[in-house]
Amino acid sequence: SNQWQYTINNPRTFFSVPAGETILKIAILFRSGNGNLKQANTDGSDMYIPVYTTTIATKFSVPAFQPTFIPVPEPISKQVGDNINLTAIANSTAENMKIYLNGTVIQNANNVNTLSANPTLSTPGNQTIVAEATLTGTTRTDTLRFFVASAPVVAPLPAGVRDGINYEPGNTSVVLVLNAPGKNRVSVIGDFPGSNWIEQTNYVMNKTPDNNYWWLRITGLTPGQEYSFQYLVDGTLKVGEPYAEKILDPFNDGFITASTYPGIKPYPTGLTTGNVSILQTNAPAYNWTVTNFNRPDKRNLVIYEMLLRDFVAAHDWKTIRDTLSYLQRLGVNAIQLMPFNEFEGNESWGYNPAYFLAP
């Protein structure tokens, strides 16, 4: 009951694929009978079934993988001393199957198409588990990678730091501070030296004694270079820095033209998901050219509320500056900008802000 099955005996015939074209995957999604419900991956993408053309292939069936275009395992949250259930399957009876943990064989069997293991994870850090199947001289593998955490270091916040990005003298280091009470582990992932968007032991944040704050000092930064990063909370939740002054948006940055914002840092596609924060030591300072500005009397204000994107087609500050004389001729002596900090989506009046300090 409540289980449905559909069999495709020959994908090439079923989908009318020409003989010279290689079939790599079948894209699928499921809908309820009335079409109201949809089952897909957590990122909303269709699910993909790999099509194996070789005589032998293998993959992990436990732990479960999300069938994204490049399959990713369901979140694995393990600590030193935990066990992990592993099951590898093959599409044919293999002459030999093996399971490796960090390069060491932990299970081995002949003439099987299923192999299981339940190793104890004894060392912290990145773990690599490989399933291997061999038949008539051909060997195929599947690889599973995840992070095993040790107990976080408990240490008070360094003197003088506050929530967010704290730039230190010398322009080669920062202290990141995140308020995340009740969490078990927080790590920093990004394009910092040695990180490459993978959870690493030396990027696990310290926890304050009151369990409210997490902090990490990152050194070896190049002055003036932009670095992108996220916080990885409990090994599953990726969040940007709430106090960041600049972010990368995977869904909307592509619509920003070079004339509006030249040289925008590329989003790390394929390495992470969600909004990404930016930090930059020794960032160029803004040079104020008007130092004697006097505000109009607040009792005599004539305010024009302006949405930058709608007011001028170029939706940039330079064009607005060239248009100020028009507003002055109308008698306007003050402009109230509609929210121009980061907000959800790319076309909005800005009343659904996402990052209050990122213009």
What are these regions (language model features)?
Residues 302, 343-359:
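Aromatic- and acidic-residue-enriched carbohydrate-binding clefts of CAZyme catalytic domains
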